[in-house]
Amino acid sequence: MNRMGFFLMLTAAVLLTSLVCTEATPADESKVKRARWSRIEGSRLFRHRLPKSSQSTCPYCQISCCPPAYCQPSGCRGP
């Protein structure tokens, strides 16, 4: 009976662990998506925070053109 109780407890522990791990998966996926979006947003913000010496302000649209772009009446142009 002692061995039977041990295997019963072991089986219950395995089933409980698998249930807990499956329930945690959707939360982990949302964390991964959120981290991915924050990296994308962070890289967008980083592109706009270049040093002032490497930017020229476009008077037509009041934005900064980063080299090798140049300012035209319609906005920043260049590669």
UniProtKB/Swiss-Prot annotation:
Sites bearing 4-hydroxyproline, chain numbering: P59, P67, P68, P73
Keyword Disulfide bond: yes
Disulfide linkage: C58-C66, C61-C71, C65-C76
Principal place of residence: secreted
Cleavable signal peptide: 1-24
Expressed in which tissues: Expressed by the venom duct.
Record localization: Secreted
Keyword Cell division: no
GO molecular function terms noted in the UniProt entry: toxin activity
Propeptide segment residues: 25-52
UniProtKB keywords: Disulfide bond, Hydroxylation, Secreted, Signal, Toxin
GO CC annotations, alphabetized: extracellular region
Family named by the database record: Belongs to the conotoxin U superfamily.
Entry text on domains: The cysteine framework is VI/VII (C-C-CC-C-C).
Protein name per Swiss-Prot or TrEMBL: Conotoxin ba-2281
